Each structure stands twice: as C-alpha cells, then as structure tokens.
C-alpha cells in the first residue's frame, strides 16, 4: 500500500510531466499501457487523470498530491494547498472575439450588446471562472447588477441573466464564433490558433502553469507530510 497517492495529468502537459518524473525518479514503468504508473519508489502510487479532475479529487482525499494547472485550481475552487509552481505548461486565459467586432476590451463588449439589447453568447470550458470574471466587470454590474450569467450545458441551465449566456465548450472553442457564439473564453500559448480563426484578444484574464497541489489533511499527517516533502525536493531538482 503506497504511503502517498499521486495524480498526474493527461493531455497537453502530460509529456512535460513525465520528463519531470523521469528526472526525479529515473525508473518509470506502465506509461502508454495503463493509467497506473510505477515509479522507482514503491511508497508513491501514481495514476494518470484529466487535469480538470485533479483539484477536486485531491480535495476529496482520493489523492494526497497532484499536478494540475492553476487555471483548473481556480475553476474548481478546490480547497487544497499549492506547494510548487513547476513553471511549465504556461498558458494565458483570454477573452477573444471576431476581428470584425469593433470592441477593444470586455467593457466595450458588454456595452455593445447591452446597447443593442442582444444576448451576449460566450463559449468556454471554464464556466465558473467565466461567470465570475464577467460579474466583476463594472459595465456588467451597471447593466445587470448581481445577476449571475446564464450557464448552459447539455444537462444544466443555471443563472438568472439571459442577456449574458455562457455555453459549455467541449473543445475547439476557437471555432465557435461568429455563427454559434459572439465571444470565447479560452486558453492560448501563442495566439496563432486565434489568428487563424480571425479572432482577436480583448482581455487577458490570468496566466496559468502546472502546479503541485496537496490535500490539506494529508499535510497534517506526519508520515504523508514527510513523504510529500521528499517528493517536492525531487521535483525541484
């Protein structure tokens, strides 16, 4: 039975994460054949999961430690401790609109649609963050007060403000405007994909990178805390 359960991300930061693990523990087995990875240290049990899931699973105690993105820690509002910024997987969360739309910032976007009395439609994988960011804007508050933007998914519809609608994206978010939505809330590395889809950035919301997070109860357990400290030392290099 491993002392520490460790969740690592599948997807865009998977390759960089495995390189880091190889530097720290030398011997790794199981990659590509299974979601359960073996390190040279038998006291660490490793499983590969989607980064979106890791903050919540760490919070719930399914895992003691995990690697995920700052963006997903914020999106899930998980009650966990960030131990280390790994400084890879760097992306920016942005709001982008079609180049033909004559607005230059989020305030201008909200004012434009409010003046025309048209619902503003946004596509995003980050429903919580998108809603909170729009609600924090002064133009939003001026027109809609404390109303929550309407969040629309295939199985859920919440929020009172039908004039600002956030649609859950399952990927290829940049392809949605202008036919399906008016704006997107997405992550970028270089911005090339946005330009290829005739989109322009009007707001940079946050910068994100891969981080090591831990369950708070695990950090209060002496044996786990000592093992986690050893892991962090190895990950720092």
Q: Which role does the model predict for each range below?
A:
Residues 1-237:
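Domain-level signature for soluble enzymes in the chorismate/prephenate branch of the shikimate pathway
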């Amino acid at each position: 039975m491993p002392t520490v359960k460790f969740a690592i991300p599948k997807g865009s930061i998977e390759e960089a994460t495995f390189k880091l693990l190889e530097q720290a523990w030398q011997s790794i087995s199981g990659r590509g054949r299974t979601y359960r990875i073996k390190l040279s240290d038998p006291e660490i049990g490793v499983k590969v999961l989607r980064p979106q899931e890791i903050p919540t699973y760490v919070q719930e105690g399914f895992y003691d430690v995990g690697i995920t993105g700052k963006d997903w820690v914020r999106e899930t509002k998980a009650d966990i401790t960030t131990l280390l910024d790994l400084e890879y997987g760097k992306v920016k969360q942005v709001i982008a609109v079609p180049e033909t739309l004559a607005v230059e910032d989020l305030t201008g976007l909200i004012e434009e649609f409010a003046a025309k009395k048209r619902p503003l439609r946004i596509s995003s994988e980050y429903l919580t963050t998108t809603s909170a960011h729009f609600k924090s804007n002064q133009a939003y508050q001026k027109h809609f007060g404390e109303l929550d933007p309407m969040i629309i998914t295939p199985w859920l519809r919440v929020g009172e403000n039908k004039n600002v609608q956030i649609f859950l994206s399952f990927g290829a978010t940049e392809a949605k405007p202008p036919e399906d939505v008016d704006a997107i809330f997405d992550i970028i590395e270089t911005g090339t994909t946005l330009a290829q889809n005739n989109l322009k950035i009007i707001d940079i919301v946050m910068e994100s990178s891969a981080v090591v997070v831990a369950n708070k109860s695990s950090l209060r357990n002496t044996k786990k805390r000592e093992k986690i400290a050893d892991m962090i030392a190895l990950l720092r290099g």
